[in-house]
Amino acid sequence: LETVCKLPRNKQELFFMFPKADFPLTINQLKNTIKDRFDSTVVLFNNEVVGFANFYEVRESQYCAIGNVIVSPCFRNRGVGTFLINAMEDIGKKKYNVSELHLSCFDANTSGLLLYTKLGYKPYEIEKYINKENEVSALIELKKCCDSK
């Protein structure tokens, strides 16, 4: 958990990963969130945690919603994000027999939006999100249909 807490380098990266958290991310904040989530998953490279994600909602035989996605800054644009999202998709399909996967991405997270659309996720809704500083963002909801076999 300590290593995952160090992945977001600044307030904006933490906001993209975990909008309700305070920077810097602490073990207690992370523990309190993941206790209510499913299948927290890390990507390891040479025994170093380089990526993290989980499901914040699971509806068996329907959909899983992927959240808390982050990749170590040193490993961005090197396939780790793709590997991580594919791993979460596999868990959703095999463990929960889902036909859709959902995720959310803020409008300012260009890298995330480009990755998710490259992986086949399509926007279906945009929500107004107001952060702790009362700043407004657009939270883009995306989904991907999949063969659950």
Give the residues covered by each predicted segment:
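Conserved glycine-rich acetyl-CoA-binding loop
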Residues: 68, 72-86, 106-114, 118
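Extended, folded domain segments that form the structural surfaces/walls around functional sites
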Residues: 68, 96, 103
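Acetyl-CoA-dependent GNAT
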Residues: 3-76, 85-87, 91, 145-147
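C-terminal "cap" of GNAT-fold acetyltransferases
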Residues: 99-102, 106-113, 118-149
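Serine/threonine-rich low-complexity intrinsically disordered regions
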Residues: 19, 26, 78, 122-125, ...
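Conserved acyl-CoA
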Residues: 83-100, 122
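Residue-level preference for beta-strand/loop junctions
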Residues: 35, 62-63, 97, 136-138
